[in-house]
Amino acid sequence: MHNLEVPEKAASLFGAAHYDGNLLILSCLHGVMGKVYADTVCSPQTAAAVIGDFTFFAGRVSHKAVAFRPKESKNDYRILIPQNRAWEEAIEAVYRGKYRKIERFATKKNPRAFDKDKLERIFSDFSRLSQRFEIVEITSQLYGQCLEMPWSRDLVSNYGSFAEFKKQGLGFVILDKGKIVSGASSYAACGDCI
């Protein structure tokens, strides 16, 4: 598999009908974050969009593509997303006995679906619960702390630096006496979306 210098060459393989404007794929295709690998650089027939733990397959099914592990893969596991049943079968064949099938649910992509009042009620309830905890935006120092702990690494690790995170992403953590105990952040960014 070849890293595409011009990721958009594989865009038609990912077709909107299959991935419905998935931000992770768009981020790869637009060259913002992640990478797109393909069977050939000139006229790809098989492609894989790789960002963080996720790999999205598209185009002509290839066992070689399924078995390919990009050098930037950080974990012992990957989340492989098939474009269709044929890709699913290829994943099952390549990783026979070594995979676990799960079903993930997408978040709502409609900005009007966000209930700001509900969030404010939750925040208000949180504030009354304890003076011990503090919700703060991720700073340069907290970015570094997130990278030090395995459970919090994914809060920031898809961004190459704090400057990149600050420019493209958004995130908050909950501190207990100065120690990060929870967090939420953007996994990826593309254009004005996170």
What kind of feature is each model-predicted range?
Residues 34-35, 40-144:
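Acyl-donor-binding surface of acyltransferase catalytic domains
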Residues 30-50, 169-184:
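Conserved beta-hairpin
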